[in-house]
Design a protein with these regions (language model features):
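Short, flexible loop motifs at catalytic/binding sites
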Residues: 1-82, 86-247
Length: 247
């Protein structure tokens, strides 16, 4: 005969307790550890710093000491292979679970990467429970779902919303749509682009003329990239704007 604890483990073998769910809903870093505990580990302190910084700007807790107002612009610079893009996809999932009217425009250096980023966000939200030992988005946010029939990889909505997500490459068309969160994810493809003044000038022009016009009043922008050049997007912003930076 099995005791009560054995029965609980059979019902809930992965150990997803109410306390863990509440923690994952409240703290983005806890959400990441629930979704992928093998990658998000306490012996990688930069991951906690990244997650807590992203959550802080989303919640308006990064305060400009000079103005007393929350920062709205965040740039984070990390080397390759540190999980920047992956963490951003989980962050968008978490934000939409917390607030399902979050509207995101994400930009990568080309449409292929932009589509992959958007698909990872969408599929993470829409994942079905196949393995009882694997935690999925709906374990944490059971009422947030992608609207069926409106789930193209690069443009989709959540149930009850008109628009939640648009992904494009640098130079793409984003007219007619505004966002509460604009994300730029590694806009530089390689070192050849990083030191090509024409490419950098085109990116800057598209950023200032097109991307910024899509950020709604009170919206935030997040730029996460590996630094290549003092003339890249982050370099120009550091010269021209007051940003909150984490490196």
């Amino acid at each position: 005969m099995r005791d009560l604890q054995d029965i609980r483990e059979l019902i809930n073998p992965e150990g997803i307790t109410d306390g863990k769910i509440v923690a994952a809903q409240a703290r983005f870093y806890d959400y990441c550890k629930m979704i992928n505990p093998k990658f998000y580990r306490d012996d990688r302190p930069y991951q906690r710093d990244l997650c807590e910084t992203l959550q802080a700007i989303f919640e308006g807790r990064l305060i400009n000491k000079d103005t007393g107002e929350p920062y709205k612009n965040l740039m984070i610079n990390l080397p390759p292979r540190h999980g920047k893009s992956y963490t951003l996809t989980l962050f968008v999932q978490w934000c939409m679970g917390k607030k399902n009217d979050t509207r995101v425009i994400s930009v990568s250096y080309n449409d292929i990467l932009a589509g992959r980023f958007a698909r990872n966000v969408r599929d993470g939200i829409d994942a079905d429970k196949i393995d009882s030992k694997v935690t999925i988005f709906h374990d944490v946010f059971p009422t947030t779902r992608v609207k069926q029939g409106d789930a193209a990889a690069q443009l989709w909505s959540l149930e009850g919303q008109f628009f939640n997500y648009l992904a494009t490459g640098f130079g793409g068309t984003i007219t007619g749509i505004g966002c509460s969160m604009g994300i730029i994810d590694d806009p530089i493809k390689n070192d050849q682009e990083a030191f090509n003044d024409h490419v950098l000038d085109e990116q800057w022009s598209w950023y200032t003329d097109t991307f910024l016009s899509r950020i709604e009043e009170g919206g935030m922008q997040i730029i996460v990239m590996t630094r290549w050049s003092t003339k890249d997007l982050c370099g120009r912003l550091l010269e021209s704007e007051d940003c909150c930076t984490a490196t």
